Amino acid sequence: MTKLPMKFRILHLLSKKENLTIHEIMNNLRDEYGTEGQFKKTIISSYIQSLKAVGMLETTDVYFDDNNELTEKYNITEYGLGRLKYLPKEWID
């Protein structure tokens, strides 16, 4: 399968799994992107924020985790689902 740009892979992942935190997103993508320089929490967080800014993702929950870190959960929006049509055919179910 063709490797997607990480932003689109995050979007695709959230079309398959709901209410994921950044840590859960990173755990799901570690095998594909774990060796890349962009696979850092700060960079992935900026990707998520940019997808939220254009309306492709939304925050579904905000809470403090066990380490007292502010944590958000994310879902894909209807608009984001509509953008999946631009993925390579092998990524579209």
Question: What positions do the PLM features span?
Answer:
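N-terminal positioning helix adjacent to the helix-turn-helix/winged-helix DNA-binding module
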Residues: T2-M6, K40
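Hydrophobic residues on short alpha-helical segments
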Residues: K7-L14
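Short capping segments at the starts of secondary-structure elements
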Residues: S15-E24
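Short, positively charged loop/turn segments that connect secondary-structure elements
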Residues: D31-S45
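Short, hydrophobic-biased segments on the C-terminal half of alpha helices
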Residues: S45-K52
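A short, conserved structural fragment
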Residues: K52-Y63
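Short, Lys/Arg-rich nucleic-acid/phosphate-binding segment
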Residues: D61-E72
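Short, amphipathic alpha-helical interaction segments positioned at domain boundaries
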Residues: E72-D93
